[in-house]
Amino acid sequence: DAVILPGTKNTISDLLWMRQNGLEARILKHSAQNKPVFGICGGYQMLGMEISDPTGEEYGGTVQGMGLLDTKTVFRPEKHRTRVHGTFGEMKGILKEMEGLPFEGYEIHMGKTELLEGCPMNQIHDTVKKKDRQIPDMEPENRIENSTDGISHGNVYGTYIHGIFDKEKIVSEIVKSLAEKKGLSMEEVEGVDLKAFKESQYDLLADTLRKHLDMKAIYQIMGMQK
């Protein structure tokens, strides 16, 4: 029903592997049937027209992308790290109901992706809040600015933001849109609050550790009084 290309530390190598093994052809066929394709980080880079690695950060040279988005990516030595909060801008295609929904996540990548001149694609301009030191080694910035976090064209979507599907409302809208395309009714879809789920799992882990470890001895080793 939908293809999500996730991030990777080996964008070019993985793209060539997918090309050699027929996966790229299947993704292109899927997109030609007007079914959604969503690329995240390295997956976003793969969806473009070209990926260039002039300084040999990963593979070296230039390779052709899948050609589903009119973008070009150039790898650079500097790694971009930042946490972002924003809102989906203008969305087209099957995910148009996501327009205006808030999201949060983080970026960590070594490439810069630019929209090719003269292409008719919709850029997703969002207000992004970059918080200071939310993840180790992230950019020490604390400001609000307008930024292009992704690009959509028809039913093809790309973004550098990891965690963009973590919010329950976003997941629900995606499931509803996919169901409606198949003629199914999903009016009462209830998603899972991922943040609350993670907290409950952390609590279970903490309870298990307290049950099976000598916590008093551990606190003494740490120099803490408990």
Describe the role of every protein-language-model region.
Residues 8-94, 99-104:
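Cysteine-nucleophile active-site neighborhood
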Residues 91-154:
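Catalytic beta-strand/loop cores that center a nucleophilic Ser/Cys/Thr
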Residues 2-5:
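Terminal amphipathic helices with adjacent charged low-complexity linkers/tails
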Residues 15-18, 119-123, 147, 170-176:
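Composition- and surface-driven signal marking solvent-exposed, interaction-prone regions
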Residues 33, 46-53, 71-75, 114, ...:
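Short, well-ordered loop/turn and helix-capping segments at boundaries between secondary-structure elements
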Residues 37, 68, 105-107, 150, ...:
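Conserved beta-strand scaffold positions in the cores of enzyme catalytic domains, especially
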Residues 36, 43, 84-89, 111, ...:
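A glycine-rich phosphate-binding loop feature that marks nucleotide/adenosyl-phosphate handling sites
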Residues 147-226:
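Acyltransferase
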